[in-house]
């Protein structure tokens, strides 16, 4: 399942992202964060981390450096 999400992220980064203005307020970018999450954690944990990160991407959040957590133990 992780491989499917990684392919979707790859396609987004190669086919869609180049046509969108740069707007990510975080480092690493949300797509890179999601890629790292799916390379590190089981798909269900990576999915939750990615959704939470993307939900913070709005004008009222300051953004900045927000790396992937080293461990994720949410039950």
Curated annotation (Swiss-Prot):
Pfam families given in the database record: YidD
Disulphide linkage map: none
SMART domains found in the cross-reference section: Haemolytic
Keywords, comma-separated and alphabetical: Cell inner membrane, Cell membrane, Membrane
Membrane topology: Peripheral membrane protein
Primary location recorded for the protein, binned into one broad class: membrane
Gene Ontology cellular component terms for the protein in this record: plasma membrane
Transmembrane annotation, as ranges: none
Cellular location(s): Cell inner membrane
InterPro entries: Membr_insert_effic_factor_YidD
Family to which the UniProt record says this protein belongs: Belongs to the UPF0161 family.
NCBIfam families: membrane protein insertion efficiency factor YidD
Matching HAMAP family: UPF0161_YidD (MF_00386)
Main function: Could be involved in insertion of integral membrane proteins into the membrane.
Protein name stated in the entry: Putative membrane protein insertion efficiency factor
Species assigned in the record: Leptospira biflexa serovar Patoc (strain Patoc 1 / ATCC 23582 / Paris)
Lineage: Bacteria, Pseudomonadati, Spirochaetota, Spirochaetia, Leptospirales
